[in-house]
């Protein structure tokens, strides 16, 4: 049973005045978030405590949205990779829709920057060694959208820079469909 299903079940037996209070509290909390996960698996993935999360599903199932949402809500310095930079156009459009005017977007660097210094970048790693230009840049969040398209060496190598100050959570999210070639069979 998902966390949301459990919560719904528990709320069913709560007296109406307390239930209304709990729902208002939930609305208040989510009002402060630019992005809120869909009920079900996406919510379970969002709140999952795993440091590295593989999130699969069918086309249109919210995998890329999850990558953006975690980056927007939780990361201080994040990056979302696709195998080719031209494949980030959908992520860029969705990100602009979610983020709006709360952050500036630099189209040359493919990066949003907030007034408080927080950033979320779109990147690519097509060739086996294309992780190298990203090396040395510590990030507290990395997502590999369509993870089954990446080489294991790319993810493992750049993952060494998934770091944060003490007390700050780091996350790697791997939204993916099944791999289309042997490259993704890791």
Label each residue range with its predicted role.
Residues 2-186:
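Phosphate/NTP-binding elements of NTP-utilizing enzymes
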């Amino acid at each position: 049973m998902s966390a949301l299903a459990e919560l719904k079940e528990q709320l069913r037996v709560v007296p109406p005045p307390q239930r209304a209070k709990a729902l208002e509290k939930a609305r208040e909390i989510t009002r402060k978030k630019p992005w809120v996960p869909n009920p079900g698996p996406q919510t379970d993935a969002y709140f999952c405590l795993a440091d590295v999360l593989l999130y699969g599903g069918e086309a249109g199932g919210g995998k890329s949205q999850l990558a953006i949402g975690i980056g927007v809500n939780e990361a201080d310095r994040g990056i979302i990779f696709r195998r080719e930079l031209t494949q980030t156009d959908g992520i860029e459009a969705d990100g602009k829709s979610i983020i709006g005017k709360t952050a500036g977007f630099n189209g040359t660097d493919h990066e949003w920057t907030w007034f408080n210094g927080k950033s979320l970048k779109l990147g690519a790693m097509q060739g086996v060694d294309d992780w190298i230009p990203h090396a040395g840049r510590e990030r507290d969040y990395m997502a590999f959208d369509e993870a089954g398209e990446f080489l294991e060496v790319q993810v493992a190598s750049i993952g060494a820079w998934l770091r944060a100050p003490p007390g700050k959570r780091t996350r790697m999210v791997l939204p993916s469909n099944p791999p289309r070639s042997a490259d993704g069979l890791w």
